Amino acid sequence: MKDNRLLAAALIAIGIMLLGWYIKGGIDNFANKDRHVTVKGLAEREVPADKVTWSISTKVTGNDLPMLYEGLNLQTDKIKKFLKQNGLDEKEITVNPPSISDLEAREWGENNKNFRYIISTTITVATNKVEQVNKAIFRQGELLKQGVAIENSYANYEYASFQQMKPEMMAEAIKNAQKTAEQFAEASNASLGEIQTAGQGQFEIDDRDQNTPYIKKLRVVTTITYSLRN
């Protein structure tokens, strides 16, 4: 009888201990349930553009269409020769069909013009020879000396290899986010838990500045939420 009472007391004591352990675990879980930190991770690179599209527009004006057409062809040939002399290939050069404007055909046009027709065309260079294009742009004044009227000249630079940089930059952004979260956890007397949510990451490509559009600034920002533990 005495042994039965001792056994019952022991079982009750064990039950109380287990109950206390479960209660403590539940309280700890409840306390940690809503503890989290959301941080951003940043990765940046500066890289040279690896693709450029350069458009050069030229025009001639006058009253004799056949002569104007010949004059436009002459200017186009001079531009193409200039481009090839600066290291660009025929396959990288495209000449658009000429565009003709008849000023007399415009109802709102002025009648005191010294010429009737404007014939224009655009020569486009698409290449990965960024350095050669940059040099040619600085030398395009040579075309003016040859009598070529450049109406407009615009170069658009790109970084086409961006997709290859994404994994490396994303990994760096995540690493930086984790580092920030660990610093926050340490300052809060907590330890960093698992990732609760993670953003895909926002990628941006911009010119480094307005004077060097051929230098690109790559930027990726990721947002991650970590749990915190006591």
Please give the residue ranges for each predicted region.
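Short, charged, surface-exposed interaction patches
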Residues: 2-9, 15-230
